[in-house]
Amino acid sequence: MPEEKQKKSVLEKALKRIEENFGKGSIMILGDETQVQPVEVIPTGSLAIDIATGVGGYPRGRIVEIFGQESSGKTTLALHAIAEAQKMGGVAAFIDAEHALDPVYAKNLGVDLKSLLISQPDHGEQALEIVDELVRSGVVDLIVVDSVAALVPRAEIEGAMGDMQVGLQARLMSQALRKIAGSVNKSKAVVIFTNQIRMKIGVMFGSPETTTGGLALKFYATMRMEVRRGEPIKEGKDVIGNVINVKIVKNKVAPPFKTAQTYIIYGKGIDREYELFNIAVNEGIVDRKGSWYYYTTLKGEEVSLGQGSSNAVQFLKDNPEIAGEIERRIREKYGLLSVEKEEQRKEKKSSGEEAS
């Protein structure tokens, strides 16, 4: 027993010295209840994807990769995340490496263009330096880099068209992510990288698909989200959108490999009510009797949503209070935390620091 007390005393002194040298919080006991906090998130803008993430959205203080084929909805998902961050009172930035952002489309998705920070960098080094500076500022909540494939190293831009530039982009990403990863965690920002799929040549077994930018992003990303375009959504003979299939291929904050299906309407983004309706029917929250749909409120009142799915979806669009109640019930069922506004989150953080 005396030996154990001596060990404990020596350990306490060592921890105290570390905190004096490197600051409070540089080392801690994992089981200490004051240190273990629930994962804070920024919603994805899609209820189905929020459920698939297991925590209700993109985890704060982490790096996220959204990758997929062309026109699969990667930028749309990133813009929806920006809109959600702004709704919470947060600051968002869009690093437009592709120089292809459509402000009209972004506005239709709910993005506040007046408060959105945007940069169209000349080369990859500049883009990643801007990301690093924004993260270190500690006041930006969400940074989107669109896309990794467009982060062209300066040497490649300045070189001749036919010059061999082996592994430049991979080295650039590896060096940048080593710097960014630590400061992202401290700032509680979310950094989303969109990425494109390429085909590996000469692959006989396994998937020939890979993403650009080397392996560093795969390692540093807390969450990797694969996006694939599904069947078209039609209104009569006209194609008005696409079903989007999402798979969480890597997740460090919840069980991975969950899937989600969402619906993107051209020019408008995610059809939230259609998505909500389908989830509610699958979960038994909305009942189907023949071709009619009914919902029983928390007060016990049975409400007719209409005949056929299109009428039921329109009813939810016309009655946001009913739609909100259904969404809350679904989130409670999956144990997803209610999202706080940014001001409330910062107040809690500051009051916690004062108490400590």
From Swiss-Prot:
Entry's localization field: Cytoplasm
Cellular component, GO, one term: cytosol
Binding site residues for ATP: G68, Q69, E70, S71, S72, G73, K74, T75
Cystine pairs: none
Signal peptide: none
CDD domains associated with the record: RecA
Keywords, alphabetical: ATP-binding, Cytoplasm, DNA damage, DNA recombination, DNA repair, DNA-binding, Nucleotide-binding, SOS response
Molecular-function GO terms, alphabetical: ATP binding; ATP hydrolysis activity; ATP-dependent DNA damage sensor activity; damaged DNA binding; single-stranded DNA binding
InterPro entries given in the database record: AAA+_ATPase, DNA_recomb/repair_RecA, DNA_recomb/repair_RecA_CS, P-loop_NTPase, RecA-like_C, RecA-like_N, RecA_ATP-bd, RecA_C_sf
Gene Ontology biological process terms from the UniProt entry: DNA recombination; DNA repair; SOS response
Entry annotated with the keyword DNA-binding: yes
Domain of life of the organism encoding this protein: Bacteria
Function comment: Can catalyze the hydrolysis of ATP in the presence of single-stranded DNA, the ATP-dependent uptake of single-stranded DNA by duplex DNA, and the ATP-dependent hybridization of homologous single-stranded DNAs. It interacts with LexA causing its activation and leading to its autocatalytic cleavage.
PANTHER family reported in the protein's UniProt record: MITOCHONDRIAL DNA REPAIR PROTEIN RECA HOMOLOG-RELATED (PTHR45900:SF1), RECA (PTHR45900)
Family the entry assigns: Belongs to the RecA family.
Protein name (database record): Protein RecA
Organism: Thermotoga sp. (strain RQ2)
